[in-house]
Amino acid sequence: MQAPLSGLKVIEFSHMVMGPCAGLMLADMGADVIKVEPIGGDKTRRLRGAGAGYFPMYNRNKKSIAINLKSTEGKAAILKMIKEADVFIENFRPGALDKLGFGYDDLKALNPRLIYCSEKGFLDGPYSHRTALDEVTQMMGGLAYMTGPPGRPLRAGSSVIDVTGGMFGAMGVMAALNERHSTGKGKYVSAALFETTVFLVGQHMAQKSVTGTPAAPMPARVSSWAIYQLFDTKDDEQVFVGVVSDGQWKILCNAFGLEHLLEDSELAENRDRVIHKDKFLPQIVEKFKLLTKAELMEKIENLGLPFSPIGKPEEMFDDLHLNAGGGLLDMEMEDGERCKLPALPISFDGERLGLHLDPPKAGEHTVELLQKLGLDIAELKSKGII
């Protein structure tokens, strides 16, 4: 399969997660993405703890050039690349690239067809000067409030705003590229962490508008469904089960010897069952507790009802479905070790997007890329430019 974005040329000035994620989306779909790094490499490479996975996860299928952008020759080399590029992606603080001569106005003058994508903390407005982080905007935009129990705001269990913000940036880039087919002109595209967070909690804002009551944090919420929770099993494990229709309710009751519940008029519809949980939930808890995790999941799956074990990230490496369907990409890390990481969750005509470049070593493609520009590699090295 020819990748959908094959032939697209992208220059990426980014670090951490949001900008690299936007570049990853385009790279996985076939774009030729060149990651521009300082001498010594992007500092994201050296993060530890919770940040140790950022670089390998969000920088596959890219080429790396490490160069001194503050030098006249280094800057000129990258500008030469940008002149022939389709897309430029950056996620630095406001004004940082303008000082280096890589701001939107500078690059628009150089390449009027360029799509310039800025991944920011905030879109235009009173907060746009602020420095933001994923966790800052999760707290600020209401997501942390909705995730933790009352009085204990809690960030989501991944860099969900960075990743989603990167996705919105990539979406904006592709829309601008489509528009360019008719206008012949580039465009400035921006996505931001704060606005991304607010978009994700939009359902709770709408709930307040519809009901007149503010949404409660998820651990304290009143579920829309009568059965939509974790259940303990015989072997002290847990399984989530959701019953979201009257038809599923009948299937559950018949399968677990609870036919008498179907005769109760107060339990006939989901909205009634939400009110009268005390009449049936203890009985379901008791029935499920008689089965092991494996037994309960097998039975629920055979019934066609929604269910899930409580998975951990490290368990996904060996997941049967992911491995069978091309959902994991086997790649070589910077230290030479191999690792399977999630593919982009999209298929085209049933085919998954694959790996064509391992996460690059810092400056791995510097010589290759500069030679294409006809530059003197030895001279650049002697001057410390690369």
What label would you give each PLM region?
Residues G40, G121-L123, L193-V198, D235-E237, ...:
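Glycine-rich beta-alpha junction loops
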Residues S159-M174, L193-V201, V244, Q248:
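Mid-domain beta-loop-alpha active-site segment that forms a flexible
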Residues E301-G325:
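Conserved PLP cofactor-binding pocket of PLP-dependent enzymes
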Residues P150-S158, H181-T197, A216-S223, S265-A268, ...:
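Conserved Rossmann-fold dehydrogenase catalytic segment
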Residues A144, G166-G186, F199-T211, C253-H260:
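Oxidoreductase and adenylate-handling cofactor-binding alpha/beta cores
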Residues I227-L303, F307:
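Aromatic-enriched alpha-helical interface/lid elements that frame and gate functional surfaces
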Residues M1-G172, A176-S182, K361, V367-I386:
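N-terminal helix-loop segment corresponding to the beta1-alpha1 unit
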Residues M333-K381:
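Flexible, small-/acidic-enriched active-site or ligand-binding loops
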